[in-house]
Amino acid sequence: MKRYFTQNAVFAGLFRMVETLFGIEIEEKRTSVWHPDVKYFEVKREGKLIAAFYADLYAREGKRSGAWMDGERTRRRLPDGKLVTPVAYLVTNFAAPVEGREATMTHDEVTTLFHEFGHTLHHILTAQEEAQVSGINGVEWDAVELPSQFLENFAWEHDVVKAISRHADTGESLPDELFKKLIAAKNFEAGAFCVRQVEFALFDMLLHAEFNPKTDSVPALLDAVRKEVAVVFPPKWNRFPQSFAHIFAGGYAAGYYSYKWAEVLSADCFSAFEEEGVLNPKTGRRFLTEILERGSSRDAIENFVAFRGRKPELDALLRLSGIVDAPQASKKD
């Protein structure tokens, strides 16, 4: 399947998609960079420069592993009235082209790219002029992943996958048969994974909200949580809490729930595009105006309600995960 996702086709399709949705133009420009592989892009709206970003895509010796986005410059209004243009870094560790052959990507790498580009857009498409609330600055911990996971959903959408795939040898897009297998693999044991995440989140929250270290037992607390939500129970000798680095060493103390909550928000936002057209510019502009441009100038839940017209619901996440079926259209006599 990797041969179907050539890097040039994926990037071209991704850029076309966000240009359509958010009314922007992305153009590569030459400038000084820290490595020959790094690319620099300007983002314009109606010909006017509004942002820029660097893309450092390939793995190399001495480079930190993983994928991430970071802000290099935040949009803000200076005391002299000058408006600072936002700039971001988009960093991954994909395999570089070899011997002149076009680089290809796994679909997992495609979703990683979409995810980090969602973060990038969140920072550079802001309309705020105060640095503290501009871009990704000040966004609540349980909503900062909304734009990234939102954009990920497009990487699983049939028409988008068709548009970004181009076989390295034949030039054909991903066949429907392989697309169905791709979705089936994504949804395999999705219910078990969801329940496991709920278990982690509930244990974390109870540990930080109600646990008394003088009288309570950590294993007993986890056992109580598992009795409430678990489907598969680990052996008695399991010592999961001792290795739960996310909440003890990774910054997610009393916040592990944010992983699943961001999925709820992002899936619900994406469902608006399913209802109104996946590449509907009108829906895209509304998402831009009510969420991306807002930064942290108002509460994230207010941003969501302004876009969706209601409070978050679970249905979209359960459906996109394959846990429940899509509702059938009612038949008319």
Residue ranges and their predicted role:
Residues M1-D333:
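Cation-handling catalytic/transport regions enriched in His/Asp/Glu
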